[in-house]
Amino acid sequence: MIELVTDSPHPIHLVDSLQNPKLFASLSTDFPLIFITNTKLNTLILPPLLDLARSLGFSVETLTIPEGEETKTGDTFLSLHQQLTDLNVPRQATLIGVGGGVILDIAGFVAATHCRGMPFIAIPTTLVAMIDASIGGKNGINLNHIKNRIGSFYLPKAVWICPRKLSFLPQQELHHGIAECIKHAYIADSAILPLLQDPNALKKEDKLSLLIKKNCLCKASVVQQDVRDYAKRQILNFGHTLGHALEMLFIGKIPHSCAISVGMVLETKLSLSLGVARSPAILHSLIQDLLRYQLPVSLKDLYMRAQIPPHNCDQILSALTYDKKKQNTPLPPFVMIEEIGLAASFDGRFCQTISKHILTKVLEEEFYAMHNN
């Protein structure tokens, strides 16, 4: 089965198996396929895919990098370029990224820049990659722990999503992807939330596939209205402004999803402080939805998980100044929620600059609660 979920802003296919020759039908055997993956997936998922490609007449090469966010660096990026150069790969070759968000970010950036652009196919193997990282063409690498400081917009030729590959993941890893599902529900599509009410239901393939499909459609719909991230696509940054600042400070001690979960809670508190959110019930609902999947909802939760001494308010404010969305203002703009399923439009900007005083107040209340509860 190959189901076209959407073809805009690029084709996204939901498949029941990657061992389907029809997936490769649009590719020419005149040019090689270059698979980029990590060392673990190179033995776990890739071999049958390589065998199929070879049986169809393709010449294939595999480039592997270590696992983890710490791999998302300029050194890794340049090493992959050097390997492609050593292989003398033509620009008509297709790069295929197989992995989670880190792999797809790096592989997509390499595809965008090698020989000024090569065809790229994404095969996401984590939930967060299936519903988020593989969609929309954003790619890049970190610089000095600053998230995605260097990167580009480069739409893939296709995305192939096989939900069955999630069976390789521990439940905790699956829950990490739920954070992005919850984000989509709160910014644009509240109809996603009923699919998340029973974590056990997601053990069923049909329920999980439906969740993936709805989230792909949600993100694709937002992106196709604003591919270059000047207006509505900004809403996908909900939770990520403070979340990325926290990731920068924690330096690999917490998963991306945990930082984003707390970021969403704090940014919803900002929405309430400024009178943008229409009811405190939004915050209560968000916290319950995150807790259902054992995701953190406070700074205290993060520090307990990371087992490191707390930072202070000034350190978080300083980290925010490196946010790539920051303009000629002390702080970057924030996405805010009006009601569940609706991000505030702010006259078409979809994000709002706030005063340092307001943010400091929210953060200080969070630190006070952490030290006194």
From Swiss-Prot:
NAD(+) binds at residues 67-72, 101-105, 125-126, 138, 147. It holds the Pfam family DHQ_synthase. Binds 1 divalent metal cation per subunit. Can use either Co(2+) or Zn(2+). One of its GO terms (cellular component) is cytoplasm. The keyword Metal-binding applies. Its EC number is 4.2.3.4. CDD domains: DHQS. It comes from the Bacteria. It is found in: Cytoplasm. It catalyses: 7-phospho-2-dehydro-3-deoxy-D-arabino-heptonate = 3-dehydroquinate + phosphate. Pathway: Metabolic intermediate biosynthesis; chorismate biosynthesis; chorismate from D-erythrose 4-phosphate and phosphoenolpyruvate: step 2/7. Zn(2+) binds at E180, H240, H256. Keywords: Amino-acid biosynthesis, Aromatic amino acid biosynthesis, Cobalt, Cytoplasm, Lyase, Metal-binding, NAD, Nucleotide-binding, Zinc. Its cofactor is NAD(+); Co(2+); Zn(2+). InterPro entries: Dehydroquinate_synthase, DHQ_synth_AroB, DHQ_synth_fam, DHQS/DOIS_N, DHQS_C. One of its GO terms (biological process) is aromatic amino acid family biosynthetic process. GO terms for molecular function: 3-dehydroquinate synthase activity; metal ion binding; nucleotide binding. PANTHER family: 3-DEHYDROQUINATE SYNTHASE, 3-DEHYDROQUINATE SYNTHASE, CHLOROPLASTIC. Catalyzes the conversion of 3-deoxy-D-arabino-heptulosonate 7-phosphate (DAHP) to dehydroquinate (DHQ). Belongs to the sugar phosphate cyclases superfamily. Dehydroquinate synthase family. NCBIfam families: aroB (TIGR01357). This is 3-dehydroquinate synthase. The gene is aroB.
